[in-house]
Amino acid sequence: MNNFPEDHPFNESNFKQNPFNVFDFGGYEHEGATLIPFDDLKDLRLPITQLRELNEAEAANIARAYEIWEMRRRKPNFADLLTIGYARELHRNSFVTIWDWAGMLRTKMTNIGVQPYLIQSQLRQLLDNTKYQLELVMQGSGLDLDSSREERLLYILGEFAYKLVWIHPFQNGNGRWSRLYADQLADVIKVSRFSWGKSIENIPARRNEMLRALRIADSTGDISAYLSWAKK
């Protein structure tokens, strides 16, 4: 159990009841009582020291971001979502109470992700390419004989989520942010959201399967395993 007050939005009892599939895994491989890396502590806005507490706080924040999106009566079109400004705004609004740098593009190397100087151009290219592909399918083009319209749209969204993680635009929170982003696009273009491995009830197993799928995609360029996991 975490140590937040009962009425605090990060208190475990408040966010365990949330219906959204976002309380699965954080950005660190080892959690539990493991301490947050020292270099990350200086950027935290919360009085926490353990990765478990950080994971809980990030999960609560992203759940709130889902709730805000659900309550939004007039959704923007997909072109308005696919901008660097919106990408940064979504991350900032999701994690602003946790990290000083929420919404700010990464400026130092991490163990995954492109070089910091490439983030802006790679992210813009991905956003523009995703917009172009969605436009083609929405207009009735961009389909092949072996896939339906929805299958093609889901492939585009799955590839989008995977490449967001691959670019790793932010210091932390990229996984949850990428899934929220893809879910918002799914709502706007009116296709079913991915379940993001929810059928795998064992959370460590769910996370491990996702990591295996990401490694396969990284090494081969084939996102089939990632799409299969995302649909479970």
Model-derived regions: residue spans:
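FIC/Doc superfamily catalytic core
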Residues: 1-232
